Design a protein with these regions (language model features):
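Active-site HxH/HxHxD metal-binding segment of metal-dependent hydrolases
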Residues: 40-124, 207-211
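Small/polar loops that bind or transfer phosphate-bearing groups
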Residues: 36-37, 85, 127, 194
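Residue-level detector of beta-strand face positions
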Residues: 12, 24, 116, 122-124, ...
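Conserved beta-strand hairpin/beta-sheet module of binuclear metal-dependent hydrolase folds
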Residues: 2-52, 144-154
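Residue-level marker for buried hydrophobic side chains located in beta-strands
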Residues: 34, 58-60, 83, 152, ...
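Metallo-beta-lactamase
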Residues: 98-102, 129-214
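Conserved S/T- and glycine-rich ATP-binding loop of Class I adenylate-forming
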Residues: 25, 62, 135
Length: 214
C-alpha cells in the first residue's frame, strides 16, 4: 500500500518489463475501485483488487502506450470495467503491437475506450472524485489524474525527469508547456505518482528537475 489517508487507499503495483507503475484507488465508502494504467500482469492486478474486497469500476489510462495498456483487454473482459482514454491518443493505441507482444508477458491489444477523457472532467466512485487534466506532449492525449493532494502524472512528469517526446505524437515544447501551466501551478506539497520510477512532489521538481530550471 502506497498511501492511506482521508479514506482513500492507493496501492501501487510495479509490472514488467519496463517497469511500469499500476495504481489501484479505493475508498472505505465503496466496494468499487479504479485502476490506473494497467500495463501488464492482469491476473496479478485482479488478485490485488480481490484482496482489497473491491470490484473494478473504471480503468483510466494516462495515455495510450502499450506499456500502460497491455492488461486492459483482459481486465475489461473479466471484470466488465469501463475503459477510458483521451480521444487524441486513439491514433497511438496499440501502435507497435508486434514488438510489444515479444516484450510484455501476455500482451493483448487494448479495446476501444468505453468513454473518452476530457479536460476538467470529474470521475466519481463512492466519495472519491478524480479530476482529469489534459497534459499533451509525451503523447497528444496524455492526461494526469488529480485526487485531493495526489497527482498521477503518467509519463508527463517523473522524479527529476520528464517524459520522452521523441516517440510518434510527442512534442517537447508542448510537454514543457503542459508541465509548467498545468502541474507546476499545483500546491508545492502535492505528491506526484508517476508512470515509472519513484514518487516525488511538485516542490521537489520545481527545485531539482533539470528540465524545469530555466
Amino acid at each position: 500500500v502506497f498511501s492511506k489517508s482521508n479514506g482513500i487507499e492507493i496501492k501501487r503495483i510495479v509490472v514488467p518489463p519496463f517497469p511500469e507503475n499500476v495504481y489501484i484507488l479505493s475508498s472505505d465508502k465503496s466496494d468499487e475501485c479504479i485502476v490506473i494504467d494497467p500495463g501488464a500482469e492482469a491476473d496479478r492486478i485482479a488478485f490485488e483488487v480481490k484482496n482489497l474486497g473491491k470490484n473494478i469500476r473504471y480503468i483510466l489510462n494516462t495515455h495510450g502506450h502499450g506499456d500502460h495498456t497491455a492488461a486492459v483487454a483482459k481486465l475489461v473482459d473479466t471484470t466488465k470495467a469501463e475503459f477510458a482514454l483521451h480521444e487524441s491518443d486513439l491514433g497511438i493505441l496499440n501502435n507497435g503491437s508486434e514488438w510489444l507482444e515479444q516484450v510484455i508477458p501476455n500482451y493483448l491489444p487494448a479495446p476501444n475506450p468505453d468513454f473518452y477523457l476530457v479536460q476538467d472532467q470529474v470521475i466519481k466512485i463512492g466519495d472519491l472524485s478524480i479530476k482529469v487534466i489534459h497534459t499533451p506532449g509525451h503523447t497528444p492525449g496524455g492526461v494526469c489524474f488529480l485526487i485531493q493532494d495526489v497527482i498521477f502524472s503518467g509519463d508527463t512528469l517523473f522524479n527529476e525527469s520528464i517524459g520522452r517526446y521523441d516517440l510518434p505524437g510527442g512534442d517537447g515544447v508542448t510537454l514543457l508547456e503542459s508541465i509548467r501551466t498545468k502541474l507546476l501551478v499545483l500546491p508545492d506539497d502535492m505528491v506526484v505518482l508517476p508512470g515509472h520510477g519513484s514518487e516525488t512532489t511538485i516542490s521537489h521538481e520545481k527545485q531539482y528537475n533539470p528540465f524545469l530550471q530555466n
